[in-house]
């Protein structure tokens, strides 16, 4: 089954999707730039070696062309594969993340609202913060020793981490709302409206 905006692998009967999230395209573009930078560095290294070893200049020249092209090809495939398959679903029952690890393997991680206890949001740098792109972490019950103790800075195997999310703070507040409603007024979870990826005040 292919994951779409409306359905996903393992979706339960009657499970309502409230929001579908992927890494922001800017993050994908940054990763592509990194691939090209690595390819350029390799080209410069091998090309400079052709001058040092004149007897092997032809072979080194070919290597200086082929290896960077291979890096660009494989790197582009990896970035595209990650962008396409890295998708998460926030539903009225849980959060489900599909995390691609290789070209052919994707890990599926889920965390029910019953087991989730705390949401943390942050941006990795000032530029990302200005672009409203950041990370949303949903901590599981196993991460927190007691309700009053501070959540550990490290992630546990049960936590869900969403990277490069647009409007990350708003999404964190939205998940907080789901958690509060689920634990205090569970019958009203069905009335929660889907999250709209627009600035606050422009969603409904």
Residue ranges of each PLM-predicted region?
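Short acidic, Gly/Pro-enriched loop/turn segments at secondary-structure junctions
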Residues: 102-107, 122-135
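Soluble periplasmic/extracytoplasmic beta-strand elements of cell-envelope proteins
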Residues: 18-20, 89-91, 96-97, 137-139
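Hydrophobic alpha-helical transmembrane segments
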Residues: 49-68
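Lipid-exposed faces of alpha-helical membrane segments in multi-pass integral membrane proteins
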Residues: 34-42, 63-74
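Conserved beta-hairpin
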Residues: 71-120
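A membrane-cytosol interface segment of integral membrane proteins
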Residues: 130-204
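N-terminal membrane-targeting/pre-transmembrane regions
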Residues: 1-53, 186, 190, 197-204
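Short secondary-structure boundary/capping segments
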Residues: 8-10, 80, 87, 127-129, ...
